[in-house]
Amino acid sequence: GEAWTRATEQEKRREGNTTELLVTQVPGERPTVVITTPAIGHVPPRPVLMFSCVDNITRMQVALMHPLDVHDIAVTLNADSRALRSHWFVRENGTLLESSRGLSGIDEIKQLFGAKTLTVDTGADNAAGKLTFNIDGLARVIAPLRDACHWAGE
């Protein structure tokens, strides 16, 4: 699917075995900002965490390498020591996990600020069950996305 391809194509440009947040910006009337990082401790092809502003919509998504056979899923987001329960959607034929869009999605992203790692726990007993990502510096790195997607009160 489109988002899965966006995430994996951006990660192909990553140099070396690094995990810092990678940012791509496309300026214009409706600017696009894409931020990605690969799952830690997985062999390639790794699942990818992606924050994006596309068509003025903020999204937090995870591109999976093994499809899930469900339409939506309860997840626990562990940001360092803070646990946040949420309900995510499964899109693109089971290959993409997606948080809520819009304001509730933005609030979910803001709760990750200050954390060094994010673990997305779907409770599934498989490779996609617990995915950990390096989100160190997210609050700083996400600044161009906040601008592009006009986060309220910024």
Where are the regions a protein language model picked out?
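A generic "folded-domain core" signal
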Residues: 1-154
